[in-house]
Amino acid sequence: MNWQTWRHITKLDPDKVITKEEIAEIAASETDALMLSGTLDVTPENLAELYDNVRDAGLPLTVEPADPSCARFEGIDYVFVPSVFNAGHPAFITGLHKEWAQHADILWDKVVQEAYVVLNPNSSVGKLTRAKCDLTPAEVAAYGIVAEKYYSMPVLYIEYSGMYGDPAVTRAVSEALSTTRVFYGGGINSGAKAAEMGQYADTIVVGNAVYEAGPAVLKETVKAVK
């Protein structure tokens, strides 16, 4: 299994309700993987419940923990760990990571480091991390260069979190990087938007559309990039 070949990831929130029928439709959508991830009210308990519901979906399973308590390895193929480069609070850059490294038994061969740039100031993640979101495409691309050239991080994640972003940002980041993979997430709720961001991003991540528009729209976004 090679996550670097994935073009489409479906993000599911442990704090949101999803039915078995919807999970079956997601599994049939040809999305490349499931990412279990949320910003608020995610606990080891509701993460475990969501895992139990999707474990037999036949798709690669990943977790993107908001804090160390939800960094689950059992039954998980990869743990994508975000470091919010434009956070206003150092805990979300390296602080929580230090606590995790100090106190947890980490299976490092399953860890994928993500350099996050959060660009929606009204989102939960934007507020929680106090992210500086008024960045130009060139500034976001510069974060990407730091991630790739200085930290050798495998992922630069452009996160608009519920809001459709500026394709110029994704394009600028894509053109600036050569080895780091570009992930884009935020506001993709149609095939047209998936195609627009997918021409620049290596991987698009679709989350809210699953809950707001249903698996049929998810399938449309998959077809647009694969």
Curated annotation (Swiss-Prot):
GO cellular component, one term: cytoplasm
Localization (cell): Cytoplasm
SUPFAM superfamilies tied to this protein: FMN-linked oxidoreductases (SSF51395)
Enzyme class: transferase
Assigned EC number: 2.5.1.41
Reaction(s) catalysed by this chain's protein: sn-glycerol 1-phosphate + (2E,6E,10E)-geranylgeranyl diphosphate = sn-3-O-(geranylgeranyl)glycerol 1-phosphate + diphosphate
Entry GO MF terms: magnesium ion binding; phosphoglycerol geranylgeranyltransferase activity
InterPro entries named in the record: GGGP/HepGP_synthase_I (IPR039074), GGGP/HepGP_synthase_sf (IPR038597), GGGP_HepGP_synthase (IPR008205), GGGP_synthase_archaea (IPR026438)
Cofactor(s) listed in the protein's UniProt record: Mg(2+)
Pathway, per record: Membrane lipid metabolism; glycerophospholipid metabolism
Residues that hold Mg(2+) according to the record: D13, T39
Origin: domain of life: Archaea
GO biological process: glycerophospholipid biosynthetic process
Membrane-crossing segments per the record: none
Keywords assigned: Cytoplasm, Lipid biosynthesis, Lipid metabolism, Magnesium, Metal-binding, Phospholipid biosynthesis, Phospholipid metabolism, Transferase
Residues annotated as binding sn-glycerol 1-phosphate: K11, Y157, I158, E159, Y160, S161, G162, G187, G207, N208
Function recorded in the entry: Prenyltransferase that catalyzes the transfer of the geranylgeranyl moiety of geranylgeranyl diphosphate (GGPP) to the C3 hydroxyl of sn-glycerol-1-phosphate (G1P). This reaction is the first ether-bond-formation step in the biosynthesis of archaeal membrane lipids.
Sequence similarity: Belongs to the GGGP/HepGP synthase family. Group I subfamily.
NCBIfam families tied to this protein: GGGP-family, GGGPS_Afulg, PRK04169.1-3
Protein name stated in the entry: Geranylgeranylglyceryl phosphate synthase
Species name: Methanocorpusculum labreanum (strain ATCC 43576 / DSM 4855 / Z)
